[in-house]
From Swiss-Prot:
Classification via NCBIfam families: RNA_3prim_cycl
Catalytic activity, reaction form: a 3'-end 3'-phospho-ribonucleotide-RNA + ATP = a 3'-end 2',3'-cyclophospho-ribonucleotide-RNA + AMP + diphosphate
Record organism: Korarchaeum cryptofilum (strain OPF8)
Superkingdom assignment: Archaea
GO MF annotation terms: ATP binding; RNA-3'-phosphate cyclase activity
One Pfam family hit: RTC
Name of the gene this protein is made from: rtcA
EC numbers on record: 6.5.1.4
InterPro entries found in the cross-reference section: RNA3'-term_phos_cycl_insert (IPR013791), RNA3'_phos_cyclase_dom (IPR023797), RNA3'_phos_cyclase_dom_sf (IPR037136), RNA3'_term_phos_cyc (IPR000228), RNA3'_term_phos_cyc_type_1 (IPR017770), RNA3'_term_phos_cycl-like_CS (IPR020719), RNA3'P_cycl/enolpyr_Trfase_a/b (IPR013792), RPTC_insert (IPR036553)
Name by which UniProt lists this protein: RNA 3'-terminal phosphate cyclase
Principal subcellular localization: cytoplasm
Cellular component terms (Gene Ontology): cytoplasm
Primary role: Catalyzes the conversion of 3'-phosphate to a 2',3'-cyclic phosphodiester at the end of RNA. The mechanism of action of the enzyme occurs in 3 steps: (A) adenylation of the enzyme by ATP; (B) transfer of adenylate to an RNA-N3'P to produce RNA-N3'PP5'A; (C) and attack of the adjacent 2'-hydroxyl on the 3'-phosphorus in the diester linkage to produce the cyclic end product. The biological role of this enzyme is unknown but it is likely to function in some aspects of cellular RNA processing.
Length: 348
């Protein structure tokens, strides 16, 4: 059996490379061997949050997996089929649900049947896009490419206890190329600010700070305030903002102990303003996540992203090892960048 061999230490050498390698293996049905997994890190090898993505995709593709244990620096993944049906994934504690969705969505839309997943874990946690970003920005922006998927938030989960619940429904999807380089005009900035098991004033202060910062730039703003004392294991708070353009541009900020609510709102608004001022169609989060879909859509795509990240650069390198494509990148890490590729397409 021939494996695609991936050096897990390439680029940042983190968990993102592992997740996308398993995702691409699941879509293409090509066995993959990943070595040097997180060897640059203080705690090298697989961590529990990485194993969650591997095992979730193994269930969906009925894969054979070797080396799937905490601390392992090498892993083999051999997918068998693109299965449909209903699955439950319990990440445990506050592992990011959004990062699991990043890994499994390409396989879900490549399946021959509809897939429904109920995922438990963290919805709003550090170092990962919040679930509201995934629903209101990522999936909204992926719809014109042909991605047929929707998210339903049932309960929020924050670090360190998690306990969030999200449902993902995905249908077989034919992907289309896109040409979106420059940022589109928009009428309003929309958003959702939440606080759970915290005083109501927290959500009000975060929202007011974001609104004030954006209105000083002459923007119309509407932010939904979500406050509850439900069965959430909490506490936690955060805000996600987005333009009503097509594509949407988004930004976010999490609350944390010791960070004033006003700073949370102002930081999110400032991040959004920076994304808008870059003048590109997609924000930097989208730039990280859209790469595989461009390669899987048959035909030429061209997109502009506000800032090329090391994650996006690594994803380009990785995709070129699975698919017969070559990306053209005009720009560089940390700068507005135009990415072009002749997508290979994927026959379902």
């Amino acid at each position: 059996m021939e494996f695609i061999r991936i050096d897990g230490s390439y680029g940042e050498g983190g968990g993102s490379l592992l997740r996308y390698a398993i995702a691409l293996s699941s879509v293409t049905m090509k066995p993959v061997e990943i070595y040097n997994i997180r060897v640059k890190r203080a705690n090298p090898g697989l961590r529990p949050q990485h194993l969650n993505a591997v095992r979730a995709l193994a269930r969906i593709t009925e894969a054979t997996v070797e080396g799937d244990e905490v601390g392992s620096t090498a892993l083999r993944f051999i997918p068998r089929k693109r299965a449909g049906g209903s699955f439950e994934i319990d990440i445990g504690t506050a592992g990011s649900i959004s990062l699991i969705i990043q890994a499994i969505l390409p396989a879900c839309i490549s399946s021959e049947e509809e897939i429904s997943l109920r995922i438990r874990g963290g919805t709003d946690v550090p170092l990962a896009p919040p679930i509201d970003y995934m629903a209101e920005v990522f999936l909204r922006n992926m719809a014109p490419l042909g991605v047929r998927a929707e998210l339903k938030l049932l309960r929020r989960g924050h670090y360190p206890r998690g306990g969030g619940i999200v449902e993902l429904h995905a249908s077989p999807s034919k992907l289309f190329p896109i040409d979106k380089v420059r940022g589109e005009k928009f009428d309003r900035v929309l958003g959702r600010c939440h606080a759970v098991k915290l005083p109501r004033s927290v959500v009000e202060r975060i929202s007011s700070s974001a609104i004030d910062t954006l209105r000083k730039e002459g923007l119309r703003v509407e932010i939904e305030e979500e406050w509850s004392e439900d069965g959430h294991l909490g506490p936690g708070a955060g805000i996600v903002l987005w333009t009503d353009s097509n594509p949407r541009i988004g930004a976010d900020e999490l609350g944390e102990k010791g960070k004033p609510s006003e700073v949370v709102g102002k930081n999110a608004a400032s991040k959004l303003l920076d994304e808008i001022k870059a003048g590109m169609a997609f924000d930097s989060h989208m730039g990280d996540m859209i790469i595989p879909y461009l390669a899987l859509a048959r035909g030429r795509s061209r997109v502009g992203i506000s800032k090329l990240t090391l994650h996006a650069e690594s994803n380009i390198w990785l995709v070129e090892r699975f698919l017969p494509v070559k990306f053209i990148v005009q720009g560089g890490v940390g700068s507005p960048t135009v990415i072009e590729v002749e997508g290979a397409g994927l026959e379902l």
